[in-house]
Amino acid sequence: MHFRVVIPARYGSSRLPGKPLADIGGRPMVLHVLDRALQAGAESVVVATDDARVQAAVEAAGHQALLTSPDHQSGTERLVEVAETLGWPDDTLVVNVQGDEPLIDPALIREAARQLVVHTDAVMATLAHPIHDHADFVNPNVVKVVADEAGYAVYFSRAPIPWPRDAFAAEQPMPHEIGALRHIGLYAYRAGFLRTYASLASSPLERCEMLEQLRVLWHGYRISLGVTPTAPAPGVDTADDLARVRALFAAV
């Protein structure tokens, strides 16, 4: 299975400015993500950034980085520019690995790519993990997803879904039989669909939930959803997250 990885790495994070270059174990965070992508067996890995400092750090380590437009509203839009700049054929398999996931399991990256290979009628693939913790189920920063019988995503939300009308209240334990799923923010696409995505208008649902994958569902396309027993490792959104991940690296 051949696939490429693009790592969107935006410097100007509102909650943690300069996040891609945050030091973890003596190296910029983005290089740890890049290591994981290479361990997954990617044919190539490209860091797509909006800042020359990130580009310089990646290139100094001997890897490829592209300076992309600062006007992109999502990581997917940044991937579109990479696919166009590098002239990737339409059938090229591309996995979007978030630049703030220095502990991501390489096996998850491969699985996202495999999902798209297996489900040829999907334009996009992603992953999910069962939710067992009540706090995660009601946390808006933990994105939930529901799937149909065939394994395609029906909807993604920051709200608790599915909501069991008669068995759940916010102050009570979560019923385990509802099968709630936590979305793992990995996406696989074919380069041809990335070009199509660039022409799709953003949707009201996407803007409401602030979830870019809802644009794909809004326009009637299918997203394959692989459910994995592997729990996602903690990412880095805030200074507290960064301290937690640094501690995990120090403990290894």
Swiss-Prot record:
Highest taxon, organism lineage: Bacteria
Gene coding for it: kdsB
Annotated Gene Ontology cellular component terms: cytosol
SUPFAM superfamilies found in the cross-reference section: Nucleotide-diphospho-sugar transferases
Record carries keyword Nucleotidyltransferase: yes
Listed GO MF terms: 3-deoxy-manno-octulosonate cytidylyltransferase activity
Matching InterPro entries: Cytidylyl_trans, KdsB, Nucleotide-diphossugar_trans
Family: Belongs to the KdsB family.
Organism expressing this protein natively: Thiobacillus denitrificans (strain ATCC 25259 / T1)
Keywords annotated in UniProt: Cytoplasm, Lipopolysaccharide biosynthesis, Nucleotidyltransferase, Transferase
Localization of this protein: Cytoplasm
EC number: 2.7.7.38
Pathway: Nucleotide-sugar biosynthesis; CMP-3-deoxy-D-manno-octulosonate biosynthesis; CMP-3-deoxy-D-manno-octulosonate from 3-deoxy-D-manno-octulosonate and CTP: step 1/1; Bacterial outer membrane biogenesis; lipopolysaccharide biosynthesis
Enzyme class: transferase
UniProt catalytic activity: 3-deoxy-alpha-D-manno-oct-2-ulosonate + CTP = CMP-3-deoxy-beta-D-manno-octulosonate + diphosphate
Protein name according to UniProt: 3-deoxy-manno-octulosonate cytidylyltransferase
HAMAP family assigned to the protein according to its UniProt record, in alphabetical order: KdsB (MF_00057)
